[in-house]
From Swiss-Prot:
The gene is rpsE. It comes from Nitrosomonas europaea (strain ATCC 19718 / CIP 103999 / KCTC 2705 / NBRC 14298). This is Small ribosomal subunit protein uS5. GO terms for biological process: translation. With S4 and S12 plays an important role in translational accuracy. Located at the back of the 30S subunit body where it stabilizes the conformation of the head with respect to the body. Residues 21-84 form the S5 DRBM domain. GO terms for cellular component: small ribosomal subunit.
Length: 177
């Protein structure tokens, strides 16, 4: 009888679905609605979905039961996917994302650095296929605001070709090559 061990790269069945997207649950909150007859308990879930190649989406779901809330959040995340320009598993340049009181600073990192980021940001980077990045959360630590601030920052990432076209210069002038 052999003992099977689970490596860090092995995906759980609920993490990879048939469509090839990676899913991560960021947070689940128990919420209460107070009515005349008492309290109604429910759950709110925040999830992120990515393809491992630069696309990522976030979704929120609410329900009276956790699995339904998570499923609703996953479905919304799949519908709200956005594409981010990556280079060798990291960003092209440093960027700051903002949402509400949350600010997120993201900086490209050299090969072998890994993902140095806190909870909600780490989940986003793992599902979208970023392997080397330095990120810091400034201000609010609310997971919803951090996820939105991270996506705001990622939407600001531009390739050297995009910057060159905007400035009317060649790519070599922009990259300094």
């Amino acid at each position: 009888m052999t003992k099977t061990t689970k490596s860090a790269n092995t995906k759980t069945p609920d993490e990879v679905k048939t469509d090839g997207l990676k899913e991560k649950m960021v947070s689940v909150n128990r919420v209460t609605k107070v009515v005349k007859g008492g309290r109604i308990l429910g759950f709110a879930a925040l999830t992120v979905v990515g393809d491992g190649k630069g696309s990522v989406g976030m979704g929120k779901g609410k329900s009276r039961e956790v699995p339904l809330a998570v499923q609703k959040a996953m479905d919304e995340a799949r519908q709200r996917m956005v594409r981010v320009n990556l280079i060798n598993g990291t960003l092209h340049h440093s960027v700051i994302g903002r949402h509400g009181a949350a600010r997120v600073y993201m900086q490209p990192a050299s090969e072998g650095t890994g993902i140095i980021a806190g909870g909600p940001m780490r989940a986003i980077f793992e599902v979208m296929g970023v392997h080397n990045i330095l990120a810091k959360c400034l201000g609010s630590t609310n997971p919803y605001n951090i996820v939105r601030a991270t996506l705001d920052g990622l939407s600001k990432v531009q390739t050297p070709a995009m910057i060159a076209a905007k400035r009317g210069k060649s790519i070599d002038e922009i990259t300094g090559a």
